[in-house]
Regions:
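RNA pseudouridine synthases
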Residues: 1-219
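Non-catalytic accessory regions of SAM-dependent methyltransferases
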Residues: 183, 205-275
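Non-catalytic substrate-recognition/targeting regions of SAM-dependent transferases
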Residues: 259-263, 270, 286-361, 369
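Conserved SAM-binding loop of SAM-dependent methyltransferases across substrates and taxa
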Residues: 387-399
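Conserved SAM-binding motif I beta-strand of class I
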Residues: 401-406
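S-adenosyl-L-methionine
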Residues: 410-451
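Mobile active-site "lid"/loop adjacent to the S-adenosyl-L-methionine
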Residues: 411, 432, 449-479, 485
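C-terminal catalytic and target-recognition region of SAM-dependent MTase-like enzymes
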Residues: 489-549
């Protein structure tokens, strides 16, 4: 399952150089010190396995989501002329992009691009020249394939230029707004002056480009080859989780495939140690999952479970419940009833065959780590706590006082067992309560907490209260703010796809103001890397941490 170099990626290899057809999803070089999941590191490992020298020279790079040709030198004899050719801009490079909108006639695009800020490059009249030849290869409706020959090498140059002329690259999570099975940009041609002649390399266009032109917006999950390729890209995107820097505490539970963000909106796949959970989001009838299950089973999991998620079924009867979330695995062997998984070295219990939920929300992994880091000696209120994973993180971090609240008794009993089974020092309470009714009572009793964590469902209903994410956050934030100790923090999180982070923060600040409190610090976090953003939409999960005066 761990990403490895595939020899099929090699276009040509000699004693002096190697040309690789990089797949989408793989970084060219390490993005963080100690990581070994990028193409350069994987290629070096492959050469060592062959008993060959692993020294390679890197002369160019492609964005992680761009596929195509990369040339590496293997000897100093080759490195010097290849490096000189790239530095002198004597190398001819050609790309093909799948775009949505009218790219216009064949022409030269001329822009000035500013410096990269907050991950984005923008057109800036005071920026540096960006020049690209554009040639239209094919058009079908509002879609087109275009060939691009850049004459300059600015960061994100092709992506920004195409977006600016009204034809953004499909699947581009930063500059596009149109879904696709991946970002449709491929380096197809490379011509390098070398040894008195030239090296010429070409790469065939991946099949998803033609499928895009024919109207595809997501991978067909019944096509085993297409889905397997899509899943492989998703695994490479998560290379940092499979191969973290040496000495990193163990994390063996995370999302392997995230719906639209990885190219198939009907499918999500989670890893729980040696087991997998497949989520099928079904709008109309049951999905045909044979190809997905076969691809998943080939990864080497001991077993895999299925959760069918249907919008129209909120509280299914027992028979329907078993059909949606079978207790038995759909392949392999059954997991223990209570399985121990790990995040950043902390153990959490989960139940893979016990209904639609497992006992932990994996998209909150990094927020649990953050809470762990600020918990020593502190008090923590965990609202809408489910099975208490945030409380576990706080207690493991050294919190001395916690209160864990949820309306579901089974969830609270699981939280109690998970927390108290660690024999923590301090006082740790658990309440089966309607959060909305409890908050005023806590305020009247004068209870205060250093950290208040609130992560409600997008829609919640109790006997006396209804909550709908949006403006209802104002009242909830006001009630929570009154329970935060001066200098403490409100940790608010939502997976409401309708709200962007700024709108979410505005609701929170209005609530805090209504409570007569002020904000003296803020941090905003998006989802972790295994929950990639959907092009054109806000991140699905948003967390705002506000320090309150």
């Amino acid at each position: 399952m761990q990403p490895r170099f595939d020899p099929a990626w090699i276009v040509r290899m000699t004693d002096d150089y190697v040309v690789v057809d990089k797949p989408a999803g793989v970084a060219t070089q390490p993005e963080e010190k100690g990581l070994r999941c990028d193409l350069t590191s994987l290629l070096r490992a492959y050469l060592r396995e062959r008993g060959e020298p692993d020294g390679i020279g890197v002369h160019q790079r492609l964005d992680r989501e761009t596929s195509g040709l990369l040339l590496f030198s293997r000897t100093r004899k080759a490195s010097v002329p290849i490096a000189h050719a790239f530095e002198a801009r004597a190398v001819e490079k050609e790309y093909v992009a799948g775009v949505v909108g009218d790219p216009g006639p064949d022409r030269v695009l001329r822009h000035r691009l500013g410096e990269r800020m907050h991950g984005l490059v923008r057109v800036d009249p005071k920026g540096k020249d960006a020049v690209t030849e554009l040639r239209v290869l094919a058009r079908r409706g509002d879609r087109a394939l275009v060939a691009l020959r850049p004459h300059t090498g600015r960061t994100h140059q092709l992506r920004v230029q195409l977006a600016d002329v009204g034809a953004p690259i499909a699947g581009d999570p930063l500059y596009g707004a149109h879904p696709a099975s991946r970002m449709l940009l491929h380096a197809t041609r490379l011509v390098v002056p070398y040894a008195g002649g030239e090296l010429r390399f070409e790469s065939r266009l991946p099949p998803e480009f033609e499928r895009f032109l024919e109207g595809e917006e997501a991978v067909d999950v019944t096509d085993r080859a297409a889905f397997a390729a899509c899943l492989e890209r998703a695994l490479h995107r998560r290379g940092a989780l499979f191969s973290p820097p040496e000495g990193t505490p163990l994390t063996d539970a995370f999302r392997l495939f995230h719906r639209h963000g990885d190219g198939a909106p009907e499918i999500a796949i989670d890893r729980y140690g040696d087991y997998a959970v497949l989520h099928a989001y079904e709008e109309e009838g049951a999905l045909e999952l044979d190809a997905v299950i076969a691809s998943l089973a080939s990864l080497g999991f001991r077993g895999g479970y299925l959760k069918r998620r249907r919008r129209e079924t909120e509280k299914p009867a027992a028979a329907v419940h078993e059909a949606l979330a079978p207790e038995a695995p759909v392949f392999g062997e059954a997991a223990p009833f209570e399985l121990e998984i790990h995040e950043h070295g902390i153990a959490y219990p989960v139940r893979l065959g016990d209904g639609l939920s497992t006992g932990i929300f994996l998209d909150q992994r990094e927020n649990r780590r953050r809470l762990f880091q600020v918990s020593p000696g502190r008090s923590v209120l965990n609202l809408f706590a489910y099975c208490g994973a945030f409380t576990v993180a706080a207690v493991e971090g050294g919190a001395e006082h916690t209160l864990t609240v949820d309306a579901a008794r089974p969830a609270i009993e699981r939280a109690r067992g998970s927390v108290l089974g660690r024999n923590p020092a301090g006082e740790h309470r658990f309440l089966v309560e309607d959060v909305f009714a409890l908050l005023p009572r806590l305020a009247r009793r004068g209870e205060r907490f250093d950290h208040v964590v609130v992560d409600p469902p997008t829609h919640a209903r109790t006997k006396k209260h209804r909550f709908h994410s949006g403006k209802d956050w104002v009242g909830l934030a006001a009630a929570c703010a009154g329970l935060v100790s001066p200098g403490g923090s409100l940790w608010a999180s939502t997976n409401d796809h309708r709200m962007d982070p700024r709108g979410f923060e505005r609701f929170l600040r209005r609530g805090i103001e209504e409570a007569g409190r002020g904000v003296i610090g803020r941090k905003v976090f998006g989802p972790p890397i295994d929950f990639p953003q959907v092009p054109g939409l806000p991140p699905h999960q948003k967390t705002v941490v506000l320090t309150i005066a």
